């Protein structure tokens, strides 16, 4: 099973087109994030985020066998925990959080972790710098260690925390050092690369060596609407790196689907 665990919605896509793109790319299932990065939606407005989450619920309706919707929540806004519960009632199965103006260990974020833990929802965090020039100071991997205070949470740090990839490896390694099996680990890391191409091979080499493939998962980080060709090109980029690292087929399958399946509570075909 191939799972694309990091796809952005824009608010302009149609479910049939999304499924067609996945089919063209050879992707079985995908995590879709509620829109929050275009002019029609804002991360800093509660009504906007509620509208985005409702939109995503409608988009995936009847397609939940392949499309898993993740709500977008800003913990700094009033009633964020209540909005997360509403999103769950709408059929969304996880949440995306972007530390921007708040640190992952702040009280407002802890309330969301409590709610997500209660609802058993996985969390995808942005980690590392932002490509638009906003400060990434809130998104260093070490700041997410607070997650360990919520043992039922299962989270993924996107982009391997670039440029703090060694720090991300250190955070993820703790469970492995203590004998926790990858499928039961609290932390996973997506390889939707923030690293420029010149760094990517070494970043992935270290991550595989330190974290094992059991904690690494594929995400294209594309923005919908898009072609299957674009998604496939991101898959091909990863495949080329794995070729250079002489990675075997079972390991590739783990990175391209198995790790995300465990994170999402899915069976692996």
Listing of model-derived features with the role each one plays in the protein:
Residues 10-13, 37-40, 75-79, 102-104, ...:
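Active-site environment of divalent metal-dependent phosphoester hydrolases
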Residues 94, 106-217:
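Catalytic pocket-lining loop regions of alpha/beta-barrel enzymes
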Residues 3-5, 10, 18-42, 66-72, ...:
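Divalent metal-dependent hydrolysis catalytic cores, especially in the metallo-beta-lactamase
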Residues 37, 46-138, 183-186, 193:
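Active-site gating/metal-coordination segments in enzymes
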Residues 6, 22, 56, 60, ...:
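Conserved, mostly hydrophobic/aromatic
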Residues 6-8, 33, 70-72, 96-98, ...:
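A cross-family glycoside hydrolase active-site/sugar-binding cleft signature
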Residues 1-5, 11, 16-29, 85-86, ...:
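Mid-to-C-terminal alpha-helical segments outside catalytic/metal-binding sites
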Residues 37-62, 112, 131-146, 230-248, ...:
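Ligand-binding grooves and catalytic loops that recognize ribose/phosphate and carbohydrate rings
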């Amino acid at each position: 099973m191939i799972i694309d665990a990091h796809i952005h919605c824009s608010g302009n896509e149609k479910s049939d087109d999304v499924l067609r793109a996945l089919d063209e790319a050879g992707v079985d299932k995908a995590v879709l994030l509620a829109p929050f990065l275009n002019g029609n939606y804002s991360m800093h407005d509660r009504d906007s985020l509620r509208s985005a989450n409702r939109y995503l619920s409608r988009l995936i309706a009847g397609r939940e066998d392949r499309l898993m919707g993740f709500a977008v929540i800003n913990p700094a806004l009033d009633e964020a925990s209540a909005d997360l519960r509403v999103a769950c009632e709408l059929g969304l199965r996880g949440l995306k959080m972007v530390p921007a103006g708040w640190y992952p260990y702040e009280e407002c974020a802890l309330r969301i972790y409590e709610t997500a833990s209660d609802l058993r929802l996985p969390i995808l965090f942005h980690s590392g710098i932002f490509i638009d020039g906003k400060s990434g100071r809130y998104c260093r991997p070490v700041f997410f260690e607070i997650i360990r205070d919520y043992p039922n949470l299962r989270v993924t740090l996107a982009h391997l925390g670039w440029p703090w990839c060694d720090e991300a490896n250190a955070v993820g390694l703790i469970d492995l050092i203590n004998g926790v099996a990858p499928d039961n680990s609290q932390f996973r890391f997506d390889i939707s690369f923030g690293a420029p191409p010149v760094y990517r091979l070494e970043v992935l080499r270290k991550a595989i060596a330190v974290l094992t493939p059991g904690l690494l998962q594929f995400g294209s980080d594309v923005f919908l609407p898009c072609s299957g060709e674009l998604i496939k090109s991101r898959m091909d980029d990863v495949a080329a790196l794995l070729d250079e690292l002489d990675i075997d087929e079972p390991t590739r399958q783990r990175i391209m689907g198995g790790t995300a399946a465990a994170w999402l509570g899915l069976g692996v075909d």
